[in-house]
C-alpha cells in the first residue's frame, strides 16, 4: 500500500479504537457503579445535568503517557498542555486507593525537572453540556486532589462560541501537601458574554503553578449545572 492509503487506514483505525474504548468503558462494571453513585449525589436544586469524565469511571487504553508533547491526549477527554522543552512529565490513569472514593479511577501527573512557564490538564466537556445552556446557568465543579507538595492550582472554564472564547478562572484554595483536598467551585455564566446560539465547545483547564519535582493525583472530578436562583 502507498503512504496515502496507510495514513487513511491509520486514521480509521484510531477512530475505531476510540469507539471501542468508549463501548468497553460503558460496559465496565466499575463504570456502571460510578454512574449510579453520581446520580445519587445530592446537588443543588434544579440541577439539570451532571457528568464525570470517562477516565474517572472506566479503564482507558493506553493507561499512561511519558514525556508527552504539548496537546497529547489521554483517552478521549483529557489532554496535557505545557511549554517544557525537556518534557519530564508522566500522566497516567491510576486506581483510586480508598473504598470511600466515588470514582474507581483517577489521574496522576508526575513532574520532574520543569523549566516551562505553564502546565495544565484539560478536560473536554461533552456536547450534552451545551444543550439548553444559557447565561442564567451556573456550572459547578467538584474535585478531590492530592498534592505531593503545596502549590497553587487554578480551575479555568473555557466557553467557545463562534470565533470567541470566554474564560472564568477560580483558584482552588486550602491545598496542602500530602492531604486529599475536596474542592467545590462555581462558574457563573452571567459573567461571560457567550452567545447562546453559537456554542461550539466547552472545556476545563486545571492549571498547576510551579509544579517542579512534584506529583498531583486527581481522585475525583465531576461537573453539574443548575440555574441561578431568582431574587
Regions found by a protein language model. Give the residues of each.
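Activation corresponds to long, low-complexity, non-globular regions
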Residues: 1-86, 227-231
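Extracellular glycan-recognition surfaces and repeat-rich motifs
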Residues: 81-105
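Secreted extracellular polysaccharide-interacting domains
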Residues: 112-132, 162-164
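Extra-cytoplasmic beta-strand recognition segments
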Residues: 127-151
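Extended, low-complexity, turn-rich repeat/linker tracts enriched in Gly/Pro/Ser/Thr and Asp/Glu
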Residues: 144-153, 161-162, 210-213
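Extracellular carbohydrate recognition and processing domains
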Residues: 162-199
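Extracellular beta-strand ligand-recognition surfaces/modules
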Residues: 188-231
Amino acid at each position: 500500500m502507498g503512504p496515502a492509503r496507510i495514513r487513511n487506514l491509520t486514521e480509521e483505525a484510531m477512530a475505531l479504537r476510540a469507539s471501542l474504548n468508549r463501548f468497553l468503558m460503558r460496559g465496565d462494571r466499575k463504570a456502571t457503579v460510578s454512574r449510579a453513585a453520581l446520580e445519587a449525589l445530592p446537588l443543588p436544586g434544579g440541577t439539570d445535568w451532571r457528568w464525570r469524565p470517562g477516565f474517572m469511571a472506566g479503564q482507558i487504553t493506553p493507561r499512561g503517557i511519558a514525556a508527552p508533547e504539548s496537546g497529547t491526549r489521554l483517552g478521549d477527554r483529557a489532554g496535557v498542555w505545557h511549554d517544557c522543552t525537556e518534557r519530564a512529565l508522566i500522566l497516567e490513569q491510576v486506581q483510586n486507593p480508598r473504598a470511600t472514593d466515588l470514582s474507581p479511577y483517577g489521574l496522576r501527573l508526575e513532574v520532574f525537572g520543569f523549566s516551562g512557564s505553564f502546565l495544565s490538564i484539560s478536560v473536554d466537556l461533552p456536547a450534552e453540556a451545551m444543550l439548553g445552556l444559557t447565561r442564567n446557568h451556573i456550572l459547578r465543579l467538584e474535585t478531590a486532589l492530592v498534592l505531593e507538595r503545596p502549590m497553587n492550582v487554578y480551575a479555568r472554564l473555557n466557553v467557545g462560541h463562534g470565533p470567541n472564547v470566554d474564560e472564568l478562572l477560580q483558584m482552588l484554595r486550602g491545598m496542602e501537601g500530602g492531604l486529599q483536598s475536596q474542592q467545590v467551585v462555581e462558574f457563573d455564566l452571567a459573567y461571560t458574554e457567550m452567545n447562546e446560539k453559537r456554542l461550539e465547545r466547552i472545556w476545563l483547564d486545571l492549571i498547576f503553578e510551579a509544579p517542579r519535582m512534584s506529583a498531583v493525583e486527581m481522585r475525583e472530578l465531576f461537573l453539574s449545572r443548575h440555574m441561578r436562583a431568582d431574587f
